[in-house]
Amino acid sequence: AYTEMALYARVNESGELELINHLGIDLGNTAEEILTRLQKQDYETGQVTTQTTQLASDNRYAHDVKQVDADSPARFNADPTRLYEASGSAGKVCVFAVRLDTFEKVESKVFYIGSNDHDDLTAIRRYLLTSLPSLPIAGEYIHRDAFSIGAKYGKDTFLFIERFGTVNIPRALALKDRIDGWLEKIKIRGLTDQILQAITFFLPNHLPRRMLAFHQRFEHHLILRVDEQSAEQTQQFLNEYFAVHSTGSYFACTEEEGRKAFLHRFAVAGAAIRYRDTHRAEVEDIVALDIALRRNDREWVEKIPADLEQHMLHKLYYGHFFCH
């Protein structure tokens, strides 16, 4: 997320550590006072600046992401036009707080798309970014293999969030880390992961039937959310597209299916770690690559040389699909 409003520490040109407050909130003068008041949320509405020339989001993003024939990414950390103090700092400063724009939540519709030809998803992406009255809200890609690993090894994450919400994840992870720390002192490693996997193995299936059916039929999956203003046009396009392209299909999600589809995408992201931690005898480690595609890339399915692929147990592909 891009912002020009941040509170961060840096080492300046003279080699001195300094705290920079560009939050637009009057928190005092000294570093100790600023950080203490921020942590305690000790400030009034009148101390928060709302009229400012500083941006709290990227006001060019909606335009840039629509340029589907451009030969550069629309979203990547090394973009020199989107480097500003804390934004894009890549760990070179210590960020304590940022201010970001918020947007009104609108009524929306979720579509689940599957295909055995990645060209289908490319064509859909290009149409949705250039022809709808408003940009899609979200588009998440999951490959069949990532779907499988996520369904099995992200199940506890899925069920925990569904029951307790994302707000409680940090507390749960902190508790798990403490238990793991105690167990490692007596040379027991990965026991909590094994127990969680064993428990979830006996629990009922958590994913909607139509998603599971698409998992069996299709290699490539796209979870699409659009606002109500764009829903009818989106559905009409998908109907017409798949009427002449037999390599894929789609369905309009119920509210529950849409919620579970995006929750599954969230769980997929951490499932590889669980797989590693429960297969330490076979898995040396994970190589995680975050790749920014050019907006005009049509051949985005990775082809790994056989001499490298033979050393890989699994290749898991997932990501944000519209912001190449």
Task: Put a short name on every predicted segment.
Residues 99-102, 112-324:
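C-terminal substrate-recognition/cap domain of FAD-linked oxidoreductases
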